[in-house]
């Protein structure tokens, strides 16, 4: 099974802790024993800090995006270092390069690709391009809610939802000042378009990601919920 995993920078590189990179590497190695794995890493706090400085000195948003992409690739290189010879040695910089890297039989780790695309959007486009069997978005929340749970104490968590429902929630949440959706609008639209089996889950503990993916990869019933997450169905 080919699995694309999007790991947010705030999850993977929150404190730039070597032990956390190593823990993620261990989980990925275990997954790779049975599956092909492609990982897209985010930029996290470091990317936001650099982008803030860039804006402060007058850089436009495209330049800021390129800076963010550079940071995502640094995080990718750190994870590659933790994976050792089980990983393709360089992070691909295009979708075609990622496809070629898969032929190595190793875990492929990459960062951003082009300005205007978030980590989740890159992962969704990549999953569609590669005809992946599953996409997992490892984020800082345990699934999709009816509204931002940080802002609304009555927010309801979905165990299972359609891609169309996801798009609606993402758009309505993003329109509210200060609220943040679990994925960005472009990623949600790509998920809807390509109809890929998608899980959005809390990725703080890489062992949780390992457990959920191993369980879901062998399920024949793809309309049931998942622990620590939300399943997106067509």
UniProtKB/Swiss-Prot annotation:
It holds the Pfam family AA_kinase. The keyword Manganese does not apply. Inhibited by UTP. Keywords: ATP-binding, Cytoplasm, Kinase, Nucleotide-binding, Pyrimidine biosynthesis, Transferase. Pathway: Pyrimidine metabolism; CTP biosynthesis via de novo pathway; UDP from UMP (UMPK route): step 1/1. One of its GO terms (molecular function) is ATP binding. This is Uridylate kinase. The gene is pyrH.
């Amino acid at each position: 099974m080919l699995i694309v995993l999007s790991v947010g920078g705030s999850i993977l590189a929150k404190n730039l802790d070597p032990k956390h990179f190593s823990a993620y590497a261990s989980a990925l190695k275990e997954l790779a024993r049975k599956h092909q794995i492609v990982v897209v890493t985010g930029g996290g706090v470091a990317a936001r800090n650099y982008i803030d400085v860039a804006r402060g000195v007058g850089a436009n948003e495209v330049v800021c995006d390129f800076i963010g992409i550079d940071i995502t690739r640094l995080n990718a290189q750190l994870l590659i270092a933790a994976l050792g010879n089980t990983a393709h040695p360089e992070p691909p910089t295009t979708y075609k390069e990622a496809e070629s890297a898969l032929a190595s039989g190793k875990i492929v780790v990459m960062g951003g690709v082009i300005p205007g695309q978030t980590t989740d959007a890159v992962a969704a486009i990549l999953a569609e391009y590669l005809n992946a069997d599953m996409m997992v978005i490892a984020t800082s929340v345990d699934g999709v809610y009816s509204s931002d749970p940080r802002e609304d104490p009555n927010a309801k968590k979905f165990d299972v939802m359609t891609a169309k429902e996801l798009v609606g929630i993402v758009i309505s949440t993003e329109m509210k000042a200060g609220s943040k959706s679990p994925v960005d609008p472009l990623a949600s639209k790509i998920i809807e378009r390509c109809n890929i089996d998608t899980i959005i889950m809390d990725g703080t503990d890489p062992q949780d990601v390992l457990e959920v993916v191993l369980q879901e990869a062998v399920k024949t019933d793809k309309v049931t919920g998942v622990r620590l997450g939300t399943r997106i169905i067509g």
